[in-house]
């Protein structure tokens, strides 16, 4: 779990997302509150529930990007889902309980990686011994007992030194490795029957889990395989499940995107299985309930839910009142200006201009963007957004692709050249398309 302070979290998000200070502060405080809650004593800790967040703002201003970056910072089970993928229980489609099942699977993977990292040193030592056993099978006497001669030991140490220095990397050996899941059994089941399906699948998987098979491979590949094999042996599956469930219950974060798309439209009186029905099904999850997963029962009382939507057609008040009450923190993200676009092109880590420079450098072409050129690109994107649909920062991708079209096509024939992209180059490449509204609508 992340122990970063809110200031550090915001600083980290600033490296990737321009503006939107309120949204960054809200998610930073929410993430820090997870850590604060874990410092409390048990009777009070159970009573402190997370304050769920609703992010409201036009498309392309950074809502989803904040979620993506937060997932990397959180070091906690995290899942991002689209609200439009779900239907009410009993109808064809995914039900909302699958969010928690997927989150638990994500936690299992995360905890497993942490346990493997923790046991890596022991696994590396064991893997090294298995490689040396394959290279130098221990001598046996006539009764089949292993003899331990000093000469054998010194030879083993010499091989160990060569192995660690990488001198044996390309030598091929034959090793025994776990067969793993040899029976690729995939069972399809109707919605609601996932639990039975998972039990059947684990039964078939366990049938072949203890088998080993011989494989011939290079030592450098064998070492990686054996380290994974040994690390897996050091992990207790039951303990792993319990740790994963605890991680989900105490630190889990669910990001629900496009929540405005499940708002009720007008005075429609029929069954609304993918809109209001989904909202009603989300209520118990957000409020706190127990969900059955293949790893065990998971309580959702302390999972943090962050919902986001553009709310261009619907309004937050169109959500059913019970769900509104369960999303107490509202954050509005502002539309981006031309100055914001200019900063987006240059300031973030791995900005668009840096990406294009790196891509062209692979062909031996050096690209330089002048300050004036960046300003012109930002203005062009902003004007097209104003004239047509406002798709926010995503417009920069279409504008940059149009600008770099000729260079991208001819780069393989321009090895060793330097291309200076200035204001005149930008005006020549984008001028006509930006000025003509019809062309803007269909090309950018």
Curated annotation (Swiss-Prot):
Record keywords, A-Z: ATP-binding, Chaperone, Cytoplasm, Nucleotide-binding
Keyword flag Cytoplasm: yes
GO molecular function: ATP binding; ATP hydrolysis activity; peptidase activity; proteasome-activating activity
Entry keyword Metal-binding: no
Subcellular location: Cytoplasm
Binding, ATP: 18, 60-65, 257, 322, 394
Record region (Disordered): 143-163
Record InterPro entries: AAA+_ATPase, ATP-dep_Clp_protease_ClpX, ATPase_AAA_core, Clp_ATPase_C, HslU, P-loop_NTPase
Protein family according to the UniProt entry: Belongs to the ClpX chaperone family. HslU subfamily.
UniProt-recorded name of the protein: ATP-dependent protease ATPase subunit HslU
Source organism (scientific name): Haemophilus influenzae (strain 86-028NP)
Gene: hslU
